[in-house]
C-alpha cells in the first residue's frame, strides 16, 4: 500500500500531537564518604532537614546535617554495600510509617515492616514519625484512670489516661515487668497498647512477645522492635514511629498506652549519631538538643478534647475524647537519678515510679519506693474506691521506714511504736505482688479495706500472702456480681462500704488460712 505525501504529512502530524514528553527534575547527589552508618553527600542542594534520600541499594538515608557544601545523612539499616561515587537522589518526603488497626497483634521494625513472619499488614494509611504535639487549646485535663493492676502503683502513684509517668530504676529492678503487666491489664479495658523496644536483645523482645501472647494481650498490642543489632538510626527513630502508631488511635477518639523501653538507650543511639556527624558534644558527651529529643516525643502523649477529635475525623467521630498515655522507662546507674538523661525526663514527665534495687533484692516486688515515687496528675483520675481506701497506705509506709531506722538502735520500744512497726511490715508484705497477676479494682478495694480498717492486726506476718489469696478467692466466689459491678464503676459509698465490711467480717469469722 502506497501513501501519498498528504497522507504521510497527516500521519506525522497526528503522531506529533499524540507524542507526550514528561520531564522530571530530580535533585541528585554523589556519596563522598561512608563510615559507621553515616554518609556524606555532595550535591542535593534542595534537600530538606529530615528528608528521605533514596540510595541505589533500595534503602533510604535520612538527612540530618545540612552543611554549606555537603549533606550528612544516617543510613536506615546496613551500610556496608554503599561506596563512594554512588549516586543518590531526594525523594521530597519525610519518613512515614504505616498506621491502623491492622498492626495490632503484630511485631514490626522501626519502618513498620513486619518481622514476625505472619505475612503482610493491611494498614489504614501512613503517618509522619515527627508530628507537632497537640496545642494547649486542644487538650483536656486527665481524669480517667489507667489501671496497671498493681496495688502499689494504683494506690500510691495512680496513672491517668493522657499522662506521662516515668518508670525509673537500676538494671534488673523490674521496670519492664511493671510495664508489661500494665499492658496485660488493658486486655479487657479497650485501651490499645504499643510496646517500643529500643536497644534490647532480640531474645528479650521475643520473650516479651511470648508473654503477651500467653496472657491474651498481644491481639491488643503493637510491638515495635529496634533490637541491639539494629543501626543507631533505627534505634533513635523507633520511639517516634511507635508514637505515630499510637496517635492514630488517640486522634480518632480512642485510648492508647505506649511503653518506651527504654529512652536511655535511645539517647545513647542519638549521641552516637550526633558524634559521628561531628556535632559539638555537651554534658556526658550528649548533644545540646538531647532534652528536645525526649520533650518533643513525650509531649505527644496527651488527652485531646472532643473538638480536636471531631475536627481530625471531619465529623465522623463526635463527643469523644482521645488519649495517648506514655510510660517511658529510664535506666539509672547505681541509683543516680541526678544524671543528665534521668533529670531531663523527670522534668518532662508528670511523675515517676522509682524502683529501688535494695527493695528488689529484699523481696519487695514491685520494688516501688513510695517516698520519692509521685504522680502529679493521676490523683484526679484515681477511682473513688481506691482513692478513699488508699489514703493511709503512704503515711503508714513513711512512718514505718522512719521508725525502722530508729528501731535498729533501740532495744526497748513502747507498744505504740511496736504496733506501728508491725502495721508497716504487714502493709509492705501486702503490697508485694507476683508478675503477670494483675488485680481488678474490686480486688484492690477489698485488700485496701482490710488494711484501712484493721483486719490485718491479728494476722501473722508470714500468713499475710495466704490471707490475701484466700480473701480474694472468697470475695470473688461469694460476691461475684458485686465485685464485677465495683470493678466497672469504681465508686465508693456507704452501701459499698457496708458490703465490703460484710465480706471481711464473714471471711474472718468462717475462714482459716
Curated annotation (Swiss-Prot):
The keyword Cell division does not apply. The lineage of its organism: Bacteria, Pseudomonadati, Pseudomonadota, Gammaproteobacteria, Pasteurellales. It is an enzyme of class 7 (translocase). GO terms for molecular function: ADP binding; ATP binding; proton-transporting ATP synthase activity, rotational mechanism. This is ATP synthase subunit alpha. Produces ATP from ADP in the presence of a proton gradient across the membrane. The alpha chain is a regulatory subunit. It comes from the Bacteria. Its EC number is 7.1.2.2.
